[in-house]
């Protein structure tokens, strides 16, 4: 896995040994006492929160919104062929490295061009094929939001069965609809609040 995602992940620079006194395993309570910087204590607190929410037993499904696309008003072709802009391509390049941190082993995308272009580089660099899902297009979602959810839910179940990460690239309206269903699956109200209720701009 590490070899496959090396190009997407980018170079990893070793820490300056002069900044490391020693490496040791300690309890959370002990680590909290040892940390002298407030930012480090904040990171530890976030880690503890995630563990208490069950993150160690969880699997990763990454929701990706396509990069900045050509404005609808300026595009003369059909909406499914509207490409990402140079800014969108830059966003896709940056996103590539972010996604590689999670080591997805399955890539799903709306077949519309802007979604495919956003996640295509990760596919090229890892050798993973792109699987297109017609129900996740904007038009398909507008016509049948339940079919879009069923398509996404199938990928969610596959991810849980395989115990490996999946990345799904789609459109803002579709993500908003998916969030509505995901809120119903949340085990706690605090977890539910993390899924914003308005249409997400990501």
Predicted regions and their residues:
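Short, structured interface segments
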Residues: 26-55
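Unchanged
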Residues: 1-34
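Active-site-proximal alpha-helix that buttresses catalytic centers in soluble enzyme cores
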Residues: 41, 50-52, 56-144, 176, ...
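Short, surface-exposed amphipathic charged segments that create phosphate/polyanion-binding patches used
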Residues: 144-151
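Short, conserved phosphate/pyrophosphate- and ester-handling motifs at nucleotide-, phospho-/glycolipid
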Residues: 27, 66, 171
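Active-site-adjacent alpha-helix immediately C-terminal to a catalytic or transition-state-stabilizing loop
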Residues: 53-54, 153-202
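Non-catalytic terminal regions of proteins
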Residues: 131, 152-153
């Amino acid at each position: 896995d590490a070899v496959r995602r090396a190009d997407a992940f980018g170079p990893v620079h070793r820490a300056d040994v002069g900044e490391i006194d020693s490496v040791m395993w300690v309890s959370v309570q002990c680590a909290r006492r040892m940390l002298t910087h407030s930012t480090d204590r904040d990171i530890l607190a976030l880690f503890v929160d995630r563990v208490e929410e069950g993150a160690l037993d969880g699997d990763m499904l990454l929701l990706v919104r396509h990069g900045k696309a050509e404005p609808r008003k300026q595009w003369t072709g059909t909406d499914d062929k509207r490409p990402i802009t140079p800014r969108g391509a830059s966003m896709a390049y940056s996103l590539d490295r972010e996604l590689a941190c999670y080591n997805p082993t399955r890539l799903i995308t709306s077949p519309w061009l802007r979604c495919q272009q956003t996640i295509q580089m990760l596919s090229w660099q890892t050798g993973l094929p792109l699987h297109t899902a017609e129900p996740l297009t904007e038009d398909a979602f507008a016509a049948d939001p339940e079919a879009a959810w069923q398509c996404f839910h199938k990928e969610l179940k596959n991810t849980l069965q395989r115990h490996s990460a999946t990345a799904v690239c789609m459109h803002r309206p579709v993500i908003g609809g998916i969030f509505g269903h995901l809120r119903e699956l949340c085990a706690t109200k605090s977890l539910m609040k993390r899924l914003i209720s308005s249409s997400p701009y990501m």
